[in-house]
Amino acid sequence: MPIKVLSSLDVARTQWYHFKAIIVAGMGLFTDAYDLFCIAPVMKMISHVYYNGDSINTAVLSTSYAIALLGTATGQLVFGYLGDRVGRRRVYGLCLIIMILSSFGCGFSVCTTRRSCVMVSLGFFRFFLGLGIGGDYPLSATIMSEFANKRTRGAFIAAVFSMQGLGILVSSAVTMAVCVAFKRSGGGLEVDAAAPTEADLAWRLILMIGALPAALTFYWRMLMPETARYTALVENNIVQAAKDMQRVMSRSHISDEATTDPPPPPPPPSYKLFSRCFFRLHGRDLFAASFNWFLVDIVFYTSNLLLSHIFSHYSKKPSTAENVYDAAFEVAELGAIIAACSTIPGYWFTVYFIDKIGRVKIQIMGFFFMAVIYLVAGIPYSWYWSKHEHNNKGFMVLYGLVFFFCNFGPNTTTFIIPAEHFPARFRSTCHGISGAAGKLGAIVGTVGFLWATKKMESDDKNQIYPEVNRMRIAFLILGGVCIAGILVTYFFTKETMGRSLEENEHDQDNNAESEDEPQIVDGQSSVSTLLQTR
């Protein structure tokens, strides 16, 4: 009986509720991207306000970037686990509340000692901001995968993730608008060491605006019912699952497919998380999802840091002509160009092709083309690209393709695959583990890049700079990371296109039974039991 109810999800036509779920779930990813990527121009403004235009100390800068990523990794682990323990819906709203409060907290990072105390306060609130952002990752992916039908599930999850591209674009647009407005109001018109006092308000305003999209969707997120798969397979409440599906899918006959008797107590799971049986059944999938996410985030976050330094290196604008607003505007403008020309198209190419050619092929293709681009840019960098200014546009276009193939490739598929591989009672937890591994890769790429490119000058000041040999080495290392991603994907990642979430678990349980494991024979998984009712 339960399998009939869940089959209704897999064969359901695309309805308005699917698009509503994309918007509600995607707005969390929109907020995530806004908050994580607005920090680059904000740190540029802080360097003028609190450091008199000098580069921020490398230790402070790397900590500022890493603290939110560390919070994100923590949130993915904690809220991913809670999503399986107490339900997706109950935890979903809590993540949004944390993001809203932390965004406002970042804007109110004030203290009498100014520089040091403000940075500590900002880091404190950005950790909790990352905590909420991290929780949103596994919950958004899991909720969308469990609501979607199997024909277009990949496109729906990719559409949710594509809201990150819009978040990056809006983050850049808001930053540019704030900079223009404050500059025209009279502050920062001249090039001087001391930034106007209004600039201290400008960067705070940019951070606090990030709370608005989350606040606007909080009401709609609270109206979302629990997913039918969690209710049916984890709570074993088939009647409630049918009622929830009837509410959102406009199918009155769904409730007739469910029994009207009180639901029996849920059967004990045949194996526990991180048990020997779990690793035998799902260890390969968890390794592939986690390691691929780790690799792609090294590339993605390092590429974003390299971006501003590469383009400023090729830019003909004199660096001495920047004031506090121009400095932040230039960084935001660059982010907007990349988002509009490379990042967003990459996301939507994935939305269109993900259910046509599959997750694995797109992931391998993305890693492959990124590896080619990095090697083509890296091998001749010291003797060609760095010495031929007439090719600067060609180099910028080439480097922009990295972001296209990253998003029409592993950056999106690593978000999708963990939401499809694992049983319902472990799905959110395993997605959180995979995402946390990715954020550890982001920390490695971010902190490693900042320290690898640190330069000590005669006046003992630190600054980041595109030194030729180190840039070449960075490109070659990133190319090698992409090649590693190809190998891990090819040998360890399994395709999930066109298959229901239950079919994936059913096949794995059948494999376990064929090996005559007493643990599986004595207690089958809940999905295997449901499938036998056909």
Swiss-Prot record:
Residues 522-534 have a biased composition (Polar residues). It comes from the Eukaryota. One of its GO terms (molecular function) is symporter activity. Residues 510-519 have a biased composition (Acidic residues). Residues 1-21, 83-90, 145-153, 221-281, 355-361, 418-431, 494-534 are cytoplasmic. The chain crosses the membrane at residues 22-42, 62-82, 91-111, 124-144, 154-174, 200-220, 282-302, 334-354, 362-382, 397-417, 432-452, 473-493. One of its GO terms (cellular component) is membrane. Its main location: membrane. It is found in: Membrane. It is a multi-pass membrane protein. SUPFAM superfamilies: MFS general substrate transporter. Residues 43-61, 112-123, 175-199, 303-333, 383-396, 453-472 are extracellular. High-affinity transporter for external inorganic phosphate. Belongs to the major facilitator superfamily. Phosphate:H(+) symporter (TC 2.A.1.9) family. This is Probable inorganic phosphate transporter 1-8. The lineage of its organism: Eukaryota, Viridiplantae, Streptophyta, Embryophyta, Tracheophyta. The gene is PHT1-8.
